[in-house]
UniProtKB/Swiss-Prot annotation:
Entry keyword set: Aminoacyl-tRNA synthetase, ATP-binding, Cytoplasm, Ligase, Metal-binding, Nucleotide-binding, Protein biosynthesis, RNA-binding, tRNA-binding, Zinc
GO biological process: alanyl-tRNA aminoacylation; negative regulation of DNA-templated transcription
UniProt KW Disulfide bond keyword: no
Binding locations of Zn(2+): 564, 568, 676, 680
Described function: Catalyzes the attachment of alanine to tRNA(Ala) in a two-step reaction: alanine is first activated by ATP to form Ala-AMP and then transferred to the acceptor end of tRNA(Ala). Also edits incorrectly charged Ser-tRNA(Ala) and Gly-tRNA(Ala) via its editing domain.
Name listed for the protein in its UniProt record: Alanine--tRNA ligase
Keyword Cell inner membrane: no
Family per similarity comment: Belongs to the class-II aminoacyl-tRNA synthetase family.
Documented EC number(s): 6.1.1.7
Species for this entry: Sinorhizobium medicae (strain WSM419)
Gene from which this protein is expressed: alaS
Enzyme class: ligase
């Protein structure tokens, strides 16, 4: 019986032997497709290859692609754990031909693999073809020897694939496995096709057409192949299982869950273990690929997945965070095939643990509210969608969990009402927001890009150049010329001005023509490679077609270079100090400062920040050359270059290396090696100095480091030095003795504050003629009573003052009211232990509170506190307590 890892390896090895390039899985967040939330199929990373927008050095490929389907039309979340084949995370095995082989070779490769390599019984296999695809029908008969009744023609869209309304498309052919007549279900196309007897294991897509319009379809000049086979389904078949959760990989994860919870995966507990096993996979892989839990976008989908698993952990009786404890089992099963799991293990573990710790409070509160709201419902009823939305919006309790919790009772949720409430809230939010209108002008840049081509960027080698003005845009419209005082955008054939990207802000400077002069206030990248210069015409006029002299602001660019290079050094130093889980989540490289966001689950200590800064400055002091090379992405990664998550890279990339490592695994090697399109210093010494000035949180699991370099850092340190000198002069000590003197003064102040508090308490107890009612204790109904309005005593000290009053009385009741500077009053009543059976401090302090215009009050029978807004009635409050005591 083959394990999942062996099955995956056999697939890739088979296609490698048959001339295919084995391409690594792309990340779960698509690099080149903003229309997708997650990678959900093997062909996603090849989409631009199929459409002809991208060229690869190979014409056939094979992959084992990690996929997530947990959002949009592919949202299987509700079914996961309760069915045999629904997953949020799965692996798709696929082979691809980009204009190389077509139907015959694709069918031959597929049939030989599953029958000869994997050894499946051909008698248990049948296939489907699109109803008009006679060619595929004939090839299955020829290659596989299948009889006509085992080649089923399907007329629905299930057997015709399209990339979209337009673009490549073509018929499909699916291979099905017959699990046997002991399982209910009919073959595809039959009335019972939804049964579980016949299971699709492989889909072959024959891309042979291009959809031009809804009515027009033409043949592709180079037909292609895209296939996809679910690894988990295939493993179930090869391991003699009918249920994906019974394969070796899931058995190992479920066993770990059973051991951690002490609960067997039996009966109604079975689904919970399955949910946890599945959701652990998707959560871990998403975190490894740079997604962190949040309240929007991909991060929110991840949070929903994690929280659903955590809800099932709670159902299994887990008292403490569970999922992070199961991570080693997952890494053991899949870490060799996907080393990113190993690299990110610490981050995944911390994130799972932290999220579950935070969520337990939300879960407990949400379940209690849900229980109250559904108490009157019975099986078959619908839970109010508005209430479900309130649970989500106010208490952070996701709809998935509401549905999951009510499922056991047979209660549904009115999702239409939930959606309506959600849409209503969004509409209200939109009504309160006014857009900038920038989107309306965005198409202009694509049109100009199509007309003139991409701008040639010269700024790596020079800060000045000559160019030709290709277009002038004013107020979103292309114009022929612009005059003094007008604000416009220029597009030129080439430029030394850097367009904002990779966190580095755009260059500024001057553009000069024969007839005019412009100040460049910003430079942006638009429309796939177009550099747009935002300008103000300062002198004369400019017109399309003119030659122009371009000059970047040298001093500003110099500061940008230093700050950008410093981010690379800080990035590497943070990874050295905090761990390799650290990855860049965002940055701002501005001329005056740099800002750097990284993945890390907790605040950095002052010692960690000190070491990070020291390591970066060590490399700066080396003053070694900063080396830039051009190479392919694969070669760069192979050499250890760090690719920043979410960045889009072409076939050829710039690799920036700087410094020589001095410690650990970096010793003797390049210290920092990153893929980067920004501008950098020539040597590390040009940075001058880096100084970290702050570290803070910007979101769950993301920390922000802000720093200064060069002159800005020196100025900052100079200002700090001047402050210390001024402080030393004020304290009449040397600068080196400031800390000791301040600590001494603080100790002295604390001592004086304690003495002052004690003096105020003694004065209040003794009475000073200004403390209102009751300068001495009096007897009321046989009980000694000491009541005073006290001045100069903080509310927090009233209790200890009351304790002292009890000691003074020996037996009796003490009531003190203090008035703060804003006119509000605080009251305390204390009763000696011998009287608490007769007199309650809580009852008496509530009387005082009422007199002060307050409500309530609380504490113990021997000591209670309250307050009120009307401090002017403090004396009345004391007398009210006396009257109540006499009562």
């Amino acid at each position: 019986m083959s394990g999942v890892n062996e099955i995956r390896s056999m697939f890739l090895d088979y296609f490698r032997k048959n001339g295919h390039e084995v391409v690594p899985s792309s990340p779960l967040v698509p690099r080149n497709d903003p229309t997708l939330m997650f990678t959900n199929a093997g062909m996603v990373q090849f989409k631009n290859v199929f459409t002809g927008l991208e060229q690869r050095p190979y014409s056939t490929a094979a992959t084992a692609q990690k996929c997530v389907r947990a959002g949009g039309k592919h949202n299987d979340l509700d079914n996961v754990g309760y069915t045999a084949r629904h997953h949020t995370f799965f692996e798709m095995l696929g082979n691809f031909s980009f204009g190389d082989y077509f139907k015959e070779r694709a069918i031959e490769l597929a049939w030989n693999l599953i029958t000869k390599e994997y050894g499946l019984d051909a008698k248990r296999l049948l296939v489907t073809v699109y109803h008009t695809d006679d060619e595929a029908f004939g090839l299955w008969k020829k290659i596989a020897g299948l009889s006509d009744d085992r080649i089923i023609r399907i007329a629905t869209s299930d057997n015709f694939w399209a990339m979209g309304d337009t673009g490549p498309c073509g018929p499909c052919s699916e291979i099905f496995y017959d699990h046997g007549d002991h399982i209910w279900g009919g073959p595809p196309g039959s009335a019972d096709e939804d049964g579980d007897r016949f299971i699709e294991i492989w889909n072959l897509v024959f891309m042979q057409y291009e959809q031009i319009t809804k009515e027009e379809r033409v043949d592709l000049p180079r037909p292609s192949i895209d296939t996809g086979m679910g690894l988990e389904r295939l493993a179930a078949v090869l391991q003699g299982q009918h249920d994906n959760y019974d394969i070796d990989l899931f058995r190992a994860l479920i066993a770990a869950s059973e051991e951690a919870t002490g609960v067997k995966a039996e009966g109604d507990r079975r689904a919970s273990h399955r949910v946890i096993a599945d959701h652990l996979r998707s959560s871990a892989f998403l975190i490894a690929d740079g997604v962190l839990p949040s309240n929007e976008g991909r991060g929110y989908v991840l949070r929903r997945i994690m929280r659903r698993a955590m809800r099932h952990a709670q159902l299994l009786g887990a008292q403490d965070p569970l999922m992070w404890k199961l991570l080693p089992a997952l890494v053991g099963q899949m870490g060799r095939a996907y080393p990113e799991l190993v690299r990110a293990e610490a981050l995944i573990s911390e994130t799972l643990k932290l999220e579950e710790t935070r969520f337990r409070k939300t879960l407990e509160r949400g379940l209690n509210l849900l229980e109250e709201a559904s108490a009157d419902l019975s099986e078959g009823d619908q839970f109010n969608g508005e209430t479900a939305f309130k649970l989500y919006d106010t208490y952070g309790f996701p709809l998935d969990l509401t549905q999951d919790a009510l499922r056991a009772k047979g209660i549904g949720v009115d999702t239409d009402a939930f959606t309506a409430a959600m849409q209503r809230q969004k509409a209200e939010a939109r009504a309160n927001w006014t857009g900038s209108g920038d989107a309306a002008t965005e198409t202009i840049w694509f049109e100009l890009r199509d007309k003139h081509g991409a701008t040639d960027f010269l700024g790596y080698d020079t800060e000045s150049a000559e160019g030709v003005i290709q277009a002038i845009v004013r107020d979103g419209t292309v114009v022929e010329s612009a005059s003094k005082g007008e604000t416009v955008q220029l597009v030129l054939n080439q430029t030394p001005f850097y367009g904002e990207s990779g966190g580095q802000v755009g260059d500024t400077g001057v553009v000069t023509t024969e007839s005019g002069k412009l100040t460049v206030t910003d430079t942006q990248k638009r429309g796939e490679g177009l550099f747009v210069h935002y300008c103000v015409v300062e002198e004369g006029s400019v017109k399309t077609g003119e030659a122009a002299a371009l000059a970047v602001d040298h001093a500003r660019r110099t500061r940008l270079r230093a700050n950008h290079s410093a981010t690379h050094l800080l990035h590497e130093a943070l990874r050295e100090v905090l761990g390799t889980h650290v990855s860049q989540k965002g940055s701002l490289v501005a001329p005056e400062r740099l800002r750097f966001d990284v993945s890390h689950p907790k605040p950095m200590t002052s010692e960690e920040l000190k070491v990070v800064e020291e390591m970066a400055n060590e490399i700066i002091v080396q003053n070694t050359p900063v080396v830039t090379r051009l190479m392919s992405v694969d070669d760069a990664i192979a050499e250890g270059a760090m690719a920043l998550f979410g960045e889009k890279y072409g076939d050829e990339v710039r690799v920036v290396s700087m410094g020589q490592g001095l410690h650990g695994s970096k010793a003797g090697k390049a210290y920092s090696v990153e893929l980067c399109g920004g501008t950098h210093v020539s040597a590390t010494g040009d940075i001058g100095l880096v100084r970290i000035v702050s570290e803070s949180a910007v979101g769950s699991g993301v920390r922000r480091v802000e720093a200064l370099t060069g002159e800005a850092a020196r100025a900052y340190l100079g200002e700090q030095d001047e402050r210390v000198k001024a402080l030393a002069a004020a304290l009449k000590v040397q600068p080196s003795d400031v800390l000791g003197r301040v600590e001494s003064l603080l100790d002295e102040r604390r001592k004086l504050e304690r003495e002052l508090t004690e003096a105020k308490k003694k004065l209040a107890l003794a009475g000073d003629g200004q403390n209102g009612s009751g300068e001495a204790a009096r007897e009321i109904g046989g009980v000694r009573f000491l009541g005073r309005v006290v001045s100069g005593v903080e509310p927090k000290d009233l209790k200890s003052l009351a304790d002292d009053g009890k000691k003074t009385l020996g037996s009796g009741v003490v009531a003190f009211v203090g008035v703060s500077g804003d006119g509000k009053a605080s009251a305390v009543v204390a009763v000696t232990d011998d009287l608490t059976s007769k007199v309650s401090a809580v009852d008496l302090v509530r009387v005082a509170s009422a007199a002060l215009g307050g409500k309530g009050g609380g504490g113990r029978p021997d000591m209670a506190q309250a307050g009120g807004p009307d401090g002017g009635r403090a004396a009345e409050a004391i007398e009210a307590v006396a009257v109540a005591l006499a009562g």
